[in-house]
Curated annotation (Swiss-Prot):
Name assigned to this protein: MYG1 protein TC_0665
Domain of life: Bacteria
A Pfam family hit: MYG1_exonuc
PANTHER family, alphabetized: METAL DEPENDENT HYDROLASE - RELATED, MYG1 EXONUCLEASE
Similarity comment: Belongs to the MYG1 family.
Length: 289
């Protein structure tokens, strides 16, 4: 007899793919956390409503998500299989599916299937999950598995929150892009950069963006492309580089000057008015106005 809202996965050492697969099923309220059964016993697995990363079968209809069998020739791990299943159910709109896949799940699939290895000095999500395994081999790993599971659930929850927030910001960015040319002016800090380029920003004439941050204002140069995000279309004057407070006030002649990054892509001002004054000064020096 099948146990409703249960999921089976293998015991022993765990990896990011089955941890992520279980986290997704829990997040979308398809299984209960206390009905995760970690085993390789085929009879026990047969009682589970869902089975991930064990069992030698991939079947959406039967809710079986293993990728180790020779008959499976796709590129997913159990994480990618479950994400696709949620998309197939209609629980994940296509845009959110693509977002979760590109930000996290695809990387899990690649690393689990041996197509990606982290370079020295870099630590991926999959590397972090692996670290939660017991240091000594052969022990009971349930405690550590559930610790890693909670971490994955928290991360996926935050990613979904960020996705929704970014989509709200995109509407604001679109409106500002339609009415501004040289500088995108925002009344609040928001996720502008990726949205700007996803909306055709490479061909937009804006060179700067301004917005409040706490009780100050930021004036930032816009990169030519998202891949070249540490560059800017129009840099601040070289003699502003790394200056603070009175030094920047002296260099700019603007009393509200606070800071200019040594990379000449970001500056901080004490008010909207000072920020606008700095913008006009830079544009004038560059011959834009």
């Amino acid at each position: 007899m099948q146990i409703p809202r249960s999921v089976g996965t293998h015991d022993g050492s765990f990896h990011a793919d089955e941890v992520t697969a279980c986290a997704l099923l829990i997040m979308f309220d398809l299984v209960d956390k206390d009905k995760i059964i970690r085993t390789r016993d085929s009879e026990k697995l047969a009682q589970c409503e869902y089975v991930c990363d064990v069992g030698g079968r991939y079947s959406i209809a039967d809710k079986r998500f293993d990728h180790h069998q020779v008959s499976y020739t796709g590129s997913w791990s159990s994480a990618g299989m479950v994400l696709d299943y949620l998309h197939h159910l209609g629980s994940l709109p296509h845009e959110e599916y693509e977002y979760l896949n590109s930000t996290l799940v695809h990387g899990v699939d690649e690393q689990d299937n041996g197509r990606f290895f982290s370079k020295e000095g870099f630590c991926s999500f999959s590397d972090i999950i692996k670290i939660y395994n017991p240091l000594e081999e052969g022990g009971n790993t349930d405690k550590e598995f559930f610790f890693a599971l909670h971490f994955a659930i928290d991360l996926l929850t935050r990613l979904r929150e960020k996705f929704r927030y970014d989509r709200i910001c995109r509407d604001v960015v679109k409106q500002v892009m339609e009415k501004e040319d040289v500088c995108l002016r925002f009344d609040r800090p928001l996720a502008w950069q990726e949205n700007f380029f996803s909306l055709g920003g490479e061909n937009h004439p804006a060179a700067f963006v301004s917005f409040p941050c706490s009780d100050q204002w930021i004036l930032r140069g816009i990169p030519p492309t998202l891949d070249r995000r540490m560059e800017v279309r129009i840099p601040f004057p070289e003699d502003w580089a790394g200056l603070l407070g009175d030094q920047l006030v002296k260099a700019t002649g603007i009393p509200g000057a606070i800071f200019c990054h040594k990379g000449l892509f970001l500056s901080v001002w004490d008010s909207r008015e000072s920020c606008e004054e700095a913008l006009n000064l830079v544009l004038k020096q560059q011959g834009v106005v």
